[in-house]
Amino acid sequence: MRGGQGAARAPVIQFTNCRILRGGALLREDLWVRGGRILDPEKLFFEERRVADEQRDCGGCILAPGFIDVQINGGFGVDFSQASEDVGSGVALVARRILSHGVTSFCPTLVTSPLEVYHKVLPQIPVKSGGPHGAGVLGVHLEGPFISREKRGAHPEAHLRSFEADAFQDVLATYGGLDNVRIVTLAPELGHSQEVIRALTALGICVSLGHSVADLGTAEEAVQSGATFITHLFNAMLPFHHRDPGIVGLLTSDRLPAGRHIFYGMIADGIHTNPAALRIAHRAHPKGLVLVTDAVPALGLGNGRHTLGQQEVEVDGLTAYVAGTNTLSGSIAPMDTCVRHFLQATGCSVESALEAASLHPAQLLGLEKRKGTLDFGADADFVVLDDSLHVRATYISGELVWQVEEARP
């Protein structure tokens, strides 16, 4: 029903009594939807001479583009890095459960794993449109194994790899193919990394720099080769130093290709990044900040021991550690919690907080005409929020896919 006459015959839904996020501002306007897309009401009125078939009162709520999570390792007991005969059912469970947190699209993320895990899991996670069944899958994020041993974090050292002489063929042999892959995180200081970055970006795959001890010069060279993202800024990289700020220095570098800027992921869970560091990053480069959850399989579960790939993770309160260590191992905060914490910690505008979880990840992936926006013609993926940014409802392609249960009298 999205194209041609089919879309034109679809019912027109008018969402009223709302504030919609468009063009960086919250506007008191109605949102018009038909055939799964955002509709221009002027064309409806003056060219088609039609009105809405249905009106829905939003009770003064905010309508924002659906959240996009480009780094999520699992959740609700599901570990994307665990090979099984039915990986798809686990992905589907997470896709369904994250709807309640306003996420309409995501990149299932695999941490460093044995080769057989990549070969078994990757073919089972195809790109998939969202709907009542769950959030859409935009492609897999492969975080490792081509990362620094020194900054491996929760990644198992035994399965880390360096690039062989025929580097891109080594990548293909490691992953077993790249058909379902959208993002690859690697350490740019590894030998042959620049040729790998060029080869991946030529295929339309986003290259992210992370788990790395790279200096600024090496990071800048990686961006010149095509890298566009930084994996969880500040975490698992050299700390900022005034004589060589390392990867962090990319936020204000003057050696990036003309017309391009770097995007960077931030885990705003109140654990991974001090509020002062959040403020420094946001004030230095607000348009590049991408909120990510980096959620682990323990998301939505209680205290105790859980898995993350080949490692055991221990959850204590709001923090997840590699079992028996003090090394952080992902987050257990969902995306809407990260948005609220980011807003509170940085003092930024509501609009900026919402765009960090929607527009910016869409721009990173080159999807800003379809996702992360409520502009005319975009996919009608949006989240309904109250003034405190708690999710009231989630829509995908204009269809209600999740709604909060109202308190009973």
UniProtKB/Swiss-Prot annotation:
Keywords from the UniProt entry: Carbohydrate metabolism, Hydrolase, Metal-binding
Binding note for cofactor: Binds 1 divalent metal cation per subunit.
EC number(s) from the headed UniProt entry: 3.5.1.25
Family, as annotated: Belongs to the metallo-dependent hydrolases superfamily. NagA family.
Record protein name field: N-acetylglucosamine-6-phosphate deacetylase
Top enzyme class: hydrolase
Keyword Amino-acid biosynthesis attached: no
Cofactor: a divalent metal cation
Binding positions for a divalent metal cation per the UniProt entry: E143, H211, H232
NCBIfam families recorded: nagA
Gene3D superfamilies according to UniProt: Metal-dependent hydrolases, Urease, subunit C, domain 1
Keyword Acyltransferase included in the entry's annotation: no
One Gene Ontology term of the molecular function aspect: N-acetylglucosamine-6-phosphate deacetylase activity
GO biological process, one term: N-acetylneuraminate catabolic process
Gene that encodes the chain: AMDHD2
Catalytic reactions on record: N-acetyl-D-glucosamine 6-phosphate + H2O = D-glucosamine 6-phosphate + acetate
Function of the protein: Hydrolyzes the N-glycolyl group from N-glycolylglucosamine 6-phosphate (GlcNGc-6-P) in the N-glycolylneuraminic acid (Neu5Gc) degradation pathway.
Residues given in the record as substrate binding sites: A154, H155, N235, A236, R243, D269, G270, I271, H272, L328, S329, G330
Any matching Pfam family: Amidohydro_1
Native species: Bos taurus
Domain of life: Eukaryota
Active-site residues from the entry: D294
